[in-house]
Amino acid sequence: AMNVTEIGSGEGPLVEEVRRLVGPKVPIAVALDFHANNTEQLVKNANIICGYRTAPHTDEEETQERAARLLLRCILENVLPECVMVCPPLLFPGEMITTEVDPCKSLIAELKKAEEKQGVWTASLFGGMPWCDAPNAGASVVVCGPKGCKEPTDEAKRIADLFWKEREKFGFEEKAMSPEDAILWAQEREASPIFISDSGDNVTGGAPGDSAYLLSLLMKHECKNVLVAGIVDRPAVEAFYLSAEGEEKKVKIGKSIDSKSTETEVTGKLKQKGFIERGGSKDIRFALIAVGGIDIILTDERCSFTTQKNIEETGAK
């Protein structure tokens, strides 16, 4: 779902340039995110397109391997497949289209049925990326197979039709509330842990991750035993990096990237500082601070916290 200023879709021009360099007789295989916003420019220049089949994503390596194996098949069989794309007029936020529950779960199963058909090498369904303000934002079904076979087109149309027919059944798997209502709801519950996801500032969805809006509400309601993971604020991290653990400092948090975001002033006590490992290198600095009963992980770069390990490496518990 890459979108580049003055270019538009990033993947299409990138693959088109690869095609220009390698020529028309070299196979090209592409592995894509489930939320890809696909274009005809991409489809006509790739021979193999494989998409993740999980959202949340747990099959990245499996998808890359599938694309690599099909690329090898192209070479061994001396075949140049082509891709067919059908785009139903649908655009869902990611929270409404998860693959662990129906109707999306059943649609993913249809991909495997399609691949049992002669003439179909691989089939992929894409939910699209709604937060990308682009003409190509939206759902798509891409099926690949040898040139001249009608099955890829037939299966792409069939699955896209099913996608459209099931459109009214998509909904939020978890409770959807306003931020303040979510906090009040959580305060009334004895069970723990309770996760509140700020879908409006979701780093994995392309957002800056610098909003302190939820933090300001948590402070307003004097919440205790809460972890905010995390907020991007390089100046705040740098300020605490000059402090010793246990030292208090008054800083403004938030609005460090997006001028339209929310900031709030806090007096925080430094609990721990260090580096967060991402992509095999420890290159993101963090500061774990305490503000009353709220712990906050501050980072100097955009950083998602999607696993328990991500959180524990900051010293937060």
Name each model-derived stretch.
Residues P13, A212-Y213, D283-I284, T307-N310:
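Short alpha-helical segments and helix-capping/turn motifs at coil-helix boundaries
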Residues E95-E301:
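Hard-cation-handling environments
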Residues D295-K317:
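A C-terminal functional module that forms or caps the active site or interfaces directly
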Residues A1-I75, D198-L215, M219, C223-V232:
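Active-site histidine-anchored catalytic micro-motif
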Residues Q64-A68, L72-K112:
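Conserved anion/nucleotide-ligand pocket segment
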